Structure formats: structure tokens, C-alpha cells
Swiss-Prot record:
Protein name, as recorded: Protein shisa-9
Alphabetical keyword list: Cell membrane, Cell projection, Glycoprotein, Membrane, Postsynaptic cell membrane, Signal, Synapse, Transmembrane, Transmembrane helix
Positions of region (Disordered): 333-373, 389-424
Organism lineage: Eukaryota, Metazoa, Chordata, Craniata, Vertebrata
Functional note: Regulator of short-term neuronal synaptic plasticity in the dentate gyrus. Associates with AMPA receptors (ionotropic glutamate receptors) in synaptic spines and promotes AMPA receptor desensitization at excitatory synapses.
Length: 424
């Protein structure tokens, strides 16, 4: 840039010097002409010699030749197509002047069409020629990056969104925690509702078991031979059944509650029936033991005590303390008849108590007889009855022995006013 300025300044000074010289030359010729005219006017009447000398003096002043103008030099520039045109000199003949425009320059002979190159600005590379390069950004003194609030707005929006997300998460956790105790209480309430059913069923089964034991005890007492009975019933080794025993095979005592399944306590369906079948098998296996018991001396002692008590009762009857004509007592119909009991349970036939076809001796007043110790048939029959009674008692002392590990029944003690009291 400095070189260009120096070049322009040199050209300008050269041009200025040339013009000054030309002006001086012109001014010198005018002065000489004026002087010559004055001389001619003032000395018109002089002689020819004097005029000749004056003319020679003037001609001698015009003798030096005029200088030719210096040729111009056109500077290099960028044309309208963006191409660089190198500088050139106008020194060919009369074409000594740089003419044209800033974008197109040439040499000419007319001085009036001369181009003032100092006014042109296409000496540098144009901005549009730098393709792919953004223009240099000028620093704006009014722009302060510290006062720009665009980034701050973005930060504020992101912070608000993050806070809303956190609030939603904590709200959800709080609601779940608030509803969780209610669900726990509901589950506990359901558990409490379902558990008493299991306990009630267990208590009810224990109560049914106690009732069954009591009823069996009463049935055993009813099935025993009375004191004045001459013909006794045949006892079976099987445990007498009762209507309550059929209900014990079901895990639920009530039909409506039996449909509800207990998720906490589930009982196997055939457990009670299997226990009852095993109990019957144990009862069937007691027959051999009863035969061995009858042959023992302890059984003889029991029979002797029995005969002594029978003799004492006969004496009381003779004295009139006991009624000689016993009244027949009608037995209440039982809810469950052993003769029509279940045919099979767990593949075993149930044994029932069969009543003898002939009527009892005490039912008829004509057949009533006092005690005769010499009657061998009565003694033999009483001995058989006592043996069978021992068998029945041994089979019915613990009818549900296998169930006592879960529900131990209490063995009641019945107090009577009879002297033939037997504790079971």
C-alpha cells in the first residue's frame, strides 16, 4: 500500500513540475511578445538597422526548442471480472496519456481525456472475490458480551423444567407412601378376616371331637349289659359311628364357609378320613388282645367282683328295695343307625352293632327271675358279656387316638349313684 502511495505521489509531483514548466514557458513567450510589441510601437520610426537588431534579439530568445510532455504510466488494477491487470507505460508515439476508466484503462493522444488514477479504489482484492471466506467482522464498540441476556434466559427455562420434574417425582413418591399403609391395613384386615375362619374351624372341630367322644361314651354305656339283663347284645370291635363323625371328614363345618378357600391354612381333603380308617384298622386288631385278656387272672378277678355285685343286687330286689317289675324304657331313635351306616370308607367295610333278634329278658314281667347263683348258663352268658364289654371298652377308650396329637380330647368323668360305677 505504501509503495502505491509513493508511486502516486511521484507521478503527481512529476505532473506538477511539468505543468509548472509549461506555464513558465508560456509566460516567457508572452512577456517577450509584449516587449517586442512595445518596442515596435515605440521605435517604429527608427532606422532599419535598429529594427533589425531588435528583431535579432527577439529571435535569439525564441531559439531554444520546446520539451515534449512525459508519457503517463497506468497503474495496475482489478477489472470488473476480478482479474488483475498489471501496470503499463504509455510511451508509444503520440499515445502518451493514460485514459479510460478505473476498470478499463488504455493510452490515448488526447490530454483532455486523461484519467485521474488517484480517485480509483480497485487496487486491492475485492471482498466478493474471497469465496468461502466470511468477511472480516468489524469490532462493534457498542456490543458488550457481558450484557447479553440470551444465555441467561436459556438457563432459566432449563432450571424451571428440572424443578418441575423433581416436584413431580417427589409428589408421586409421597402419594405412593401415603397409600401404602392403607394397602397394608387392608391386607392385614383380610388376613384377620380369613384367619378366624381357620381358628373357628379348628375350634369347631375340637368341639365336634369332644361331642363325638361324649356321644360314643354314652353309646358305650347304653350298649353295656344292664344288671338284670339275661341276654346281652353282641358288641363289635369297630368304634360306633355317630352323625357328627361324618362331618369331621370335611375341613369346613359350614357349607357356606366351606366354599371359601383359606389362603393361610389349607387342610388336606382326605386327611380325617385316612385317620378314621387307620383307627378302624387299629380297632379291628384289638380282637386278639381281648381274647388274651379274658384268659388272664386279672379278668377272673374282675368277673368275681361282678358276680358279687350281682348277688348283692339280687338280695336288694328280694327285700323290696328295687322294683321287681322293671318298666321298659323306649330308646330315642338315633340320628344315625349303625345298620345303615356307610358301606365303605377308604376301602374298608364298617362293622355295626347288631341287636339280637330275641327280646330282652327284663322287657317281659313273665320272664323276670330272681338271682340264681346255681344257673350255669347265666354265669356263662355274664362271663361272655363281661369279656365283650372289656373288648368294647378297650376299643372305645380312645376312638380317635390318631387325632389326639392335633386335638387332644378331654375324657369326662361321669358320676352316677349306681354301685356298679365303671370309670372309662
Amino acid at each position: 500500500m505504501r509503495r502505491v502511495l509513493r508511486l502516486l505521489l511521484g507521478c503527481f509531483l512529476t505532473e506538477l513540475c511539468a505543468r509548472m514548466c509549461r506555464a513558465q514557458e508560456r509566460s516567457g513567450h508572452g512577456q517577450l511578445a509584449q516587449l517586442g510589441g512595445v518596442l515596435l510601437l515605440t521605435g517604429g520610426n527608427r532606422s532599419g538597422a535598429a529594427s533589425g537588431e531588435a528583431g535579432e534579439g527577439v529571435g535569439g530568445s525564441d531559439a531554444p526548442p520546446t520539451r515534449a510532455p512525459t508519457p503517463d504510466s497506468c497503474r495496475g488494477y482489478f477489472d470488473v471480472m476480478g482479474q488483475w491487470d498489471p501496470p503499463f507505460n504509455c510511451s508509444s508515439g503520440d499515445f502518451i496519456f493514460c485514459c479510460g476508466t478505473c476498470g478499463f484503462r488504455f493510452c490515448c493522444t488526447f490530454k483532455k481525456r486523461r484519467l485521474n488514477q488517484s480517485t480509483c479504489t480497485n487496487y486491492d482484492t475485492p471482498l466478493w472475490l474471497n469465496t468461502g471466506k466470511p468477511p472480516a467482522r468489524k469490532d462493534d464498540p457498542l456490543h458488550d458480551p457481558t450484557k447479553d441476556k440470551t444465555n441467561l434466559i436459556v438457563y432459566i427455562i432449563c432450571g424451571v423444567v428440572a424443578v418441575m420434574v423433581l416436584v413431580g417425582i417427589f409428589t408421586k413418591l409421597g402419594l405412593e407412601k401415603a397409600h401404602r399403609p392403607q394397602r397394608e391395613h387392608m391386607s392385614r384386615a383380610l388376613a384377620d378376616v380369613m384367619r378366624p375362619q381357620g381358628h373357628c374351624n379348628t375350634d369347631h372341630m375340637e368341639r365336634d371331637l369332644n361331642i363325638v367322644v361324649h356321644v360314643q361314651h354314652y353309646e358305650n354305656m347304653d350298649s353295656r349289659t344292664p344288671i338284670n339283663n339275661l341276654h346281652t347284645t353282641q358288641m363289635n370291635n369297630a368304634v360306633p359311628t355317630s352323625p357328627l363323625l361324618q362331618q369331621m371328614g370335611h375341613p369346613h363345618s359350614y357349607p357356606n364357609l366351606g366354599q371359601i378357600s383359606n389362603p393361610y391354612e389349607q387342610q388336606p381333603p382326605g386327611k380325617e378320613l385316612n385317620k378314621y380308617a387307620s383307627l378302624k384298622a387299629v380297632g379291628n386288631s384289638d380282637g386278639d388282645w381281648a381274647v388274651a385278656t379274658l384268659k388272664s387272672p386279672k379278668a377272673d378277678k374282675v368277673n368275681d367282683d361282678f358276680y358279687a355285685k350281682r348277688r348283692h343286687l339280687a338280695e336288694l330286689a328280694v327285700k323290696g328295695n328295687l322294683p321287681l317289675h322293671p318298666v321298659r324304657v323306649e330308646d330315642e331313635p338315633r340320628a344315625f343307625s349303625p345298620e345303615h351306616g356307610p358301606a365303605q370308607q377308604n376301602g374298608q367295610k364298617s362293622r355295626t352293632n347288631k341287636m339280637p333278634p330275641h327280646p330282652l329278658a327284663y322287657n317281659s314281667t313273665a320272664n323276670f327271675k330272681t338271682w340264681d347263683p346255681s344257673d350255669q348258663s347265666l354265669r356263662r352268658q355274664a362271663y361272655g358279656n363281661k369279656g365283650k364289654l372289656g373288648i368294647a371298652e378297650s376299643g372305645s377308650c380312645d376312638p380317635l387316638g390318631t387325632r389326639t396329637q392335633h386335638f387332644p380330647p378331654t375324657q369326662p368323668y361321669f358320676i352316677t349313684n349306681s354301685k356298679t360305677e365303671v370309670t372309662v
